[in-house]
């Protein structure tokens, strides 16, 4: 949207103090460990952009709180490059840069905040190339440490540690289907029809570029056959809406954006039960 459209959408500039007030009204509080997903255009004209949003979040969670975002890697080799002609594969392998937590851009599909937060002084980004997260705050080092190479959405991952920290999930204008924590439920759900992918990406090992194979749930095409979900509704949105109907989560407005705040533990428990009840066959 153009600036005036955004200003009209939000009824004037959305300032740091306004965001702080709205976040507090939604239920975010001092000491929270929170993963957040943001669609900035839904909020309106944010005066100061990503810096303002991060600043307001830090104001609310305080010195004891920790912020977390899903990053990924925007310029990762495609999963299917092994289907390319051999000389193309060889050229890619020879020169594709390794994933570097300090330099590699976050996936553009995740919005502007996952690119901004890792640049914040003191932020830490996890080591996994395809499923990296970043965190800022006193719990950041523990959340990001030794992100497992295989099954990066499963046990002993940043998502699992978020739950262990009694963390929360915040959607700032982002659609309900962007809730990355639901991949953790997919990874741990006991359903035989679960889909996995195996892929190769370059990483840094002792400063040297090394190609490594990884295994994960298929988070791109879908970890399960979700065909029972109503046509036109994303599976994660269906889970989240059922969750809200069950009384899990709070809804409010941040700027002009419909926003949601959930406790991570109940989200995980509800989602894993939902998946196993509806998809186990």
UniProtKB/Swiss-Prot annotation:
Reaction(s) catalysed (UniProt annotation): a 2-deoxystreptamine antibiotic + acetyl-CoA = an N(3)-acetyl-2-deoxystreptamine antibiotic + CoA + H(+)
Keyword Acyltransferase recorded: yes
Keywords, ordered alphabetically: Acyltransferase, Antibiotic resistance, Transferase
Acyltransferase recorded as keyword: yes
EC number(s) given by UniProt: 2.3.1.81
GO molecular function, one term: aminoglycoside 3-N-acetyltransferase activity
Domain of life: Bacteria
Disulphide bonds in the chain: none
Catalytic EC class: transferase
A Gene Ontology BP annotation from the UniProt entry: response to antibiotic
Protein function: Resistance to neomycin.
Family from the record: Belongs to the antibiotic N-acetyltransferase family.
NCBIfam families: AAC_3 (NF033082)
Protein name: Aminoglycoside N(3)-acetyltransferase IX
Phylogenetic lineage: Bacteria, Bacillati, Actinomycetota, Actinomycetes, Micromonosporales
